Amino acid sequence: MASAELDYTIEIPDQPCWSQKNSPSPGGKEAETRQPVVILLGWGGCKDKNLAKYSAIYHKRGCIVIRYTAPWHMVFFSESLGIPSLRVLAQKLLELLFDYEIEKEPLLFHVFSNGGVMLYRYVLELLQTRRFCRLRVVGTIFDSAPGDSNLVGALRALAAILERRAAMLRLLLLVAFALVVVLFHVLLAPITALFHTHFYDRLQDAGSRWPELYLYSRADEVVLARDIERMVEARLARRVLARSVDFVSSAHVSHLRDYPTYYTSLCVDFMRNCVRC
């Protein structure tokens, strides 16, 4: 079972979200109950207690919620080196749906920052395989993502994760990360592209057609607003129902903290509209 090998949290409510229809089906039987599954993919260095605040948005409304954050060293170093180790984690995450026998329920992803997006890109690839192609994804919410090759922003994010580490170790890791990015994604970019596609490019060209909601802020210093706006334009060009909301003043992954009521209403309305469709 994937559950034995993955550090995740799942919350299953006592009552489902709602029924497929408010009235009996034409055959006279009660309509089948829908219980949406929401998978939260945390940002690099995110703690479960941080994701729990977002989890409550959906759990209080009767949704099954799975929370997971990929290890920060995989997010910052494995992906930068072109090592697809996150693909294994993405597969285990999707296997959880079968372990809990919820693979037939409508599925929504809520993805945070580039750390969540790096994992999500492999989810998209796995959804094209025989094992997972029947999963019913109804929508994706992106919070403060995706960003495209912002080294300064990535260094800020990594520095925040390493804040409590020894000063010398923190400096060494930051320098090592910067060197890896410059070497593999600038100097050797043509060679790297032969065996590894950047997650931003992968998302731009993704064949998924379910609705997407992008929540971002022009005040974000980690993921630039222009990167998200460019992604929205690319998805719209591929005829995906993509919508974006600019919170203007909130910092990176801080939109819920600064605008709790508005943020919650956006997520709940999007989830409900996606499930009903």
Curated annotation (Swiss-Prot):
Report the sequence similarity comment from the record.
Belongs to the TMEM53 family.
- Alphabetic keyword roster: Developmental protein, Dwarfism, Membrane, Nucleus, Transmembrane, Transmembrane helix
Can you say what this protein is called?
Transmembrane protein 53
Noted disease: Craniotubular dysplasia, Ikegawa type: An autosomal recessive, sclerosing bone disorder characterized by proportional or short-limbed short stature in association with macrocephaly, dolichocephaly, or prominent forehead. Radiography shows hyperostosis of the calvaria and skull base, with metadiaphyseal undermodeling of the long tubular bones and mild shortening and diaphyseal broadening of the short tubular bones. Affected individuals experience progressive vision loss in the first decade of life due to optic nerve compression, and deafness may develop in the second decade of life.
> Gene of origin?
TMEM53
- Share an example GO biological-process annotation for this protein: negative regulation of ossification
Q: How does the entry describe its membrane topology? A: Single-pass membrane protein
Q: What is the recorded function of this protein according to its Swiss-Prot or TrEMBL entry?
A: Ensures normal bone formation, through the negative regulation of bone morphogenetic protein (BMP) signaling in osteoblast lineage cells by blocking cytoplasm-nucleus translocation of phosphorylated SMAD1/5/9 proteins.
Q: Which residues cross the membrane?
A: 171-191
Tell me one Pfam family matched here.
DUF829
One GO cellular-component annotation of the UniProt record comes to: nuclear membrane
Where is it mainly found? Answer: nucleus
The record ties this protein, via PANTHER family, to: TRANSMEMBRANE PROTEIN 53
Where it sits in the cell: the answer is:
Nucleus outer membrane
Please verify whether the record's keywords include Metal-binding: no
